Amino acid sequence: MSFSDSESSSHGGGGGDYKFFRQISRDRLLHEMLGSTKTGDSKAWKILIMDRVTVKVMSQSCKMADITDQGISLVEELFKRREPMPGMDAIYFIQPSKENIVMFLSDMSGREPLYRKAFIFFSSTIPKELVNHIKSDSSVLPRIGALREMNMEYFPIDNQGFLTDHEQALETLYAEDAENSRHFHICLNIMATRIATVFASLKELPFVRYRAAKSTASRDLVPSKLAAAIWDCISKYKAIPNFPQTETCELLIVDRSVDQIAPIIHEWTYDAMCHDLLDMEGNKHVIEVPSKTGGPPEKKEIVLEDHDPVWLELRHTHIADASERLHEKMTNFASKNKAAQMRSRDGSELSTRDLQKIVQALPQYGEQVDKLSTHVELAGKINRIIRDTGLRDLGQLEQDLVFGDAGAKDVINFLRTNQDTNPENKLRLLMIYATVYPEKFEGDKGVKLMQLARLSPVDMKVISNMQLIAGSPENKAKSGSFSLKFDAGKTKQANRKDRSGEEETWQLFRFYPMIEELLEKLVKGDLSKSDYLCMNQSSHKEESEARTGSVRKSSAPTAVPERKATPHSMRSRRTATWARPHSSDDGYSSDSVLKSASTEFKKLGQRIFVFIIGGATRSELRVCHKLTSSLRREVVLGSTSFDDPPQYITKLKLLSEKDIQGAPAQPFKPQYW
């Protein structure tokens, strides 16, 4: 029996291609865990047993085919009834909880164990008393092939993103009287443990920075409490073999108070539009396609995943740009077919739908055409929704508010002339308005606005609940009035400034989430040390190295390039046209995204991690991908959950509903089940 932690490094080693966060996680599960159990008889099949948490970890990193390739013939859940298989070995990937240990001992003790031998891997640090509990059973000890801490209790949801799976973090930590609930501290402790396993798994020791509290309110102290808990966990990992003793990366901990607009504004990228406007379940969507037999339309499930090169290329592009590129791809395919050339002899341009029908008839391009047709369907559906709901005008007003180009008259005029606008869209507009112009919601002003928008009292509560995240109000609202104060010291009515040096190629593409600005300041050393404190203050040299990423081998520049500011009007870049042709490469234009991804990032500086308490957005994930290219440092986004606007609004509603505290989260559906 061995009791140890994995000893491999996460930095890609030996001059090979750089390995991103999710790839490292996948490799550790498949090779360090499953692969390490192979004995002389490498062809012998094994059983993999997991609990409700570790099955999520596995399903977010690996496909069932990957697991089978490692010699796993059966995957089972720890607490479900299982058939005895005394002739086979079992691999346990479980949390180090008392309940799990009791169940494991029940499986392997006595004269007739369920399995021949057990290899046990824990998702996080196992307490000594539980180790002693295992060792105390003399019948089990000879049947244990390995006993290790994998330190993987996070859920990779992207090549550069992970979750702690705390869907209810917002209401558990920020709701009314949240600090008086026992769930408050339980949530923070589990969250800290899971975040810490990220650094244990990657063998990284971070500078832990966090948003400083502006008051003594418990909800305002959440980032500092989480930072302290994470640092306490990470400090204990220094005993792990090969774990760094000095800082190797950056961790920035913030909550939704730093940016309450990103979760609700209409983001115009293909990825964000799919999840905002379509009926998505996770990364899946069902569409109707023509029947191949001539019958009624058939339902087809679409999965948007990293294995799809078209999705990887288009996901972070503007929806209009994505639509143009899809049309170009269809045209290229159609040009290979004589029927297409004949149909276009009259000089008329073929529509994307016509091109789709033509390329579907090309058998030699079956899989590529299928992927392409899928995205044509999705983009077409999104564009129809944009047109039918008048979303362009609403999106323009939203961004004008954020950048200080619109005010009360514009909002009132929009609400008066667009009474049939979707109630949720009107609510999102007023939430943005309240963030930029909080004084417009003081007294009965907010009530009148909500009445003009024909929104319900429940919707009014959503806006007032934003204050619970922003901080405690100085004065309680008088009975029957509506009050909101996000920033009493605000003088300039703009929530964002146009970024100098960045040309707006597409209309409605001005908006950027605040973490982009925060991370750039962090790298340049300009992040306010009073607003963002550090748990582990070190020497100036070490801190400078962490900012520039000089410890990890990299010849590429790691700081943010200086931008030459040019005078411009915020309104001067607008156009009456829906979209303009792109004039420069935006970083997503290659048709060989999968191939170039591995070669482009052979050398990167030190990693930067940013963790957002209360849910992250598609735009924030996009920024992490963008900054990885511009900073030449992998930026990894972590959060308690990944929320689309409707989900976030629902969570805001629950902040004032006391009966939801401690309610069970939505069931998780593994991707390979």
UniProtKB/Swiss-Prot annotation:
SUPFAM superfamilies linked to this entry: Sec1/munc18-like (SM) proteins
A Pfam family that the UniProt record links to this protein: Sec1
Renumbered residue ranges of the record's region Disordered: 538-591
Asked if the keyword Transport belongs to this entry, the reply reads: yes
> What are the GO BP annotations of this UniProt entry?
protein transport; vesicle-mediated transport
Q: Which UniProt keywords apply?
A: Protein transport, Transport
Q: Does the keyword Transport apply?
A: yes
Q: Which family does it belong to?
A: Belongs to the STXBP/unc-18/SEC1 family.
Explain the purpose of this protein: Involved in the vesicle trafficking. Binds syntaxins.
Q: What assembly does the database describe for this protein?
A: Does not bind the syntaxin KNOLLE.
The name of this protein is: Protein transport Sec1a
